[in-house]
Structure formats: C-alpha cells, structure tokens
Amino acid sequence: SAKGIRPATIAAVPRSRFMGTNWQYNTTIQTTASATFNHSFNQNWKLNSVLSFQQYKRDYFSVERIQALYYPQPGTWARPLGRVDTKEKYFTGQVNLNGQFKTGKVEHILLAGADADHYITNTYNYDVQGKIYDTINILDLNKFIQRTDIPLANRVTLVETPVNRFGAYVQDLISLTPKIKLLAGVRWSLQESPSNSTTYLQKNDSIAKGKSASANAFSPRVGIVYRYKQNVSLFASYSNSFSVNTGLDIYNNTLPPSIIDQYELGVKNIFLNGKLTVNVTAYKIINNNLAQTAQFDKDGNPNSNSNLKELTGQTSSNGIELDVMANFLKGLSVIAGYSYNDMHYTKTPGNKGSYVQGERLVNTPAHTASGTIFYTFSKGKLNGLKIGASAFYVGNRFGGWNNTIQQSQNYSRLIPVDGFTTVDI
C-alpha cells in the first residue's frame, strides 16, 4: 500500500524549461457537421431532432511527460517514447417530443424521446525502437548530451473497434398543487460492443476477431419542488444514470458503462423583488466505477493516448454549492459562486496496482469560487458596450498521480499544489 511513503514535491524547474525534443509532434484534426429539424404540431406539442457527425484524428510521436519515478541522482530522468495514431468517427441522432396537457386539474409537461450513436475507433499500434529515448537531467540540461535523431517506429497492428448505443426515455413534470411539483422519469439504455478486429500488418494482413459484449439498464429519476413561500422553494432529487464510457481499455476493448447515483437537496431564495437570487445545493454523487485515462499501456509503458482508459473503482463526491445572482441597478449584473467538493476513492479492487481506498483524487480541489461583474451601457455613444471583470479561485489540491497498492515507488506520488486566483478584465 501507500502507507508510510514519503511525500513528493515539485522539482525547482523554471516554467520555461523544455524537456522534449526538437522533432516531436502532435497533430490533431477535428471535423464536425450537424443538422436539426424542429416542428410544432400546435401550441402545446413540439418535435425536435438532431443528427451529427464528428471525426477526430490524432498523430503523435514524442517523449512522454515526466513520471513520478525515483532516480538515485537528483533530477535524472530517462525519457520514455510514446506513439499514438488514431482515428475516431462518431455518428449520433436524437429525437424529442415535448408536450403540455392536463388530467383533470393536474398539469403535465411531458418529454419523450430516443437517441442513438455509432462509434468507430481505428488505432494503429507501433513497434518503437527503444522504449527509452535517452537520459537527461531536468535540473541541469548540460549534464548529458541529448539525442536529436528520430527513432524508428513501424506499424504493427490496426485495431478497429465499433460501439453501438441506444436509449429511450420519458419524463413528466407534474404540478400536483400550486406549491408542489413532482418530476418522474425513466430511461432505458443499451450498449453493444461488436467484436473488434485486429489486422496484423507485418503478417500478410491477417485478421483476428475479439469478443463481443452488451449491457443494458433502466435508470430512474425523481424529484420534488415545494414552494414554501412566494420567494422560497425547496427541492430534492435522485437520479440513477447508465453512463457510457468513451474510449478503449489498454487491450483495445470497449469499456463497460458506469452506474452513477446522484442525490441533491437544496433551497432557492428570491429577494428584493427578483433583484437578488441565492441558491444553495448539497449533493452526493457515487460513481460505481470511474473511468480515467490509463497510466500505462499494455506493455507497461507510460500511456500518452487519452483514448486508452481504465476503470479505477468506486468514487464518492460530497459537496455543497452556493450561487448568487444580483441585478441591483439597470445594466449591472453580478454573479458569484462557491463550491466545496470532497471526492475520494471509496471502493477499489484492493489488488496490486489498484488505487488506494480513501485517497482524494488528484486535480480535485476541495474549494473553488468565482465572481463576475458586468455593466452594460444603455445610453449615449456607449450604448450597448459591456465592460466588466471576473475572478476565479481554485483551492489547494493534489497534482501528480494517485498512489497504487504495492507501487514500485517508496514515496507518495501525490504532489501538494497551492491554490491560485486568476482575474480577467
């Protein structure tokens, strides 16, 4: 486990220091297209639909980012190589029917619809000559002579992975009384992963088929709003979602979905005839199996492909959010917010390489806050001009990497990072 290991620190390296090579590259191309269709049957019933296509290509060859590793000589780093060559195509479609009607004195706002998508990933795997490019010292780049040549990297396999997803849903917002509204809904989701195909490019393009898989689930959603006073509303909700995970595991298989339970409880206050709104929400979110970018590829090398992911275990987020909106003067808008989030691993497999139960996730600060103030001129030569400022605060957090059970490092991979504030004018 990670008990008793020394804390890590950030090396005293200037921001301007470049630890890559002069030949490395990362080329990405994105293409998107969409079409929408809207139709009104009458004042109460409307139909809308959307079709879209997305394509993403990435061609990457570089030394990898620095890892939390131990070297006897301070600052010494053996630079590993990474090669990524992927193409993703994503076809989606969605149709919704919105309607309003009454059953007796009870008012209903109905939403019913369906969505589907087809996802294809083509991944080239390479045989890179030498997993380690060379060794440098990040504290003093003059200690070693750096390589400048481009290593050989030959295509070995092409893996094509298709995924099909479909969902159908219905929800109804019911006004039981002028003070009480009830939201109830359910969604059925299906994910099919047909067998992927691996083409061995150096073996006469022979093809091997992987395993197919499918999963489906019903996901309920329920909520209630109670207007305690004209300007005070209380609300509570629960939702269960069948969250499909994009990307592939390190063996180019599709990831199973994650099940997420979310609970919310809050109050909405309106003061000063609508000039001031204050909302407070408490929440708990449980993800039964969080998908994150894989640390290593199937050969044990540091992973640079953000499309390769791993299921890391159950996480729990407990938090509270405060939102304030004010419009005291004509043209003046003030928005402020604060959030507290406590996110930890609450259940992990417990075997070697799994994350440590109870540890806070990296890059999840406990405290964040933001504020904006804008003024829009409505008279004279400056009519329509908007000026303002915004500030964002991110609290203390851990950078680096979460620790794993029986990890090779005898120190913590968590790096304490101080909070910061940015101001834009």
Q: Residue spans of the language-model regions?
A:
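Acidic/polar loop-and-plug regions of large Gram-negative outer-membrane beta-barrel proteins
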Residues: 1-40, 55-88, 132-156, 161, ...
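Residues that define the transmembrane beta-barrel architecture of outer-membrane proteins
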Residues: 27-31, 87-91, 162-166, 214-218, ...
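Surface-exposed extracellular loop regions of Gram-negative outer-membrane beta-barrel proteins
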Residues: 30-37, 44-100, 163-198, 217-243, ...
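Transmembrane beta-strands of outer-membrane beta-barrel pores
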Residues: 31, 53-59, 99-101, 114-120, ...
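Structural signature of Gram-negative outer-membrane beta-barrels, strongest in the C-terminal barrel
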Residues: 88, 107-111, 115-117, 159-287, ...
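Gram-negative outer-membrane beta-barrel transporters
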Residues: 310-402
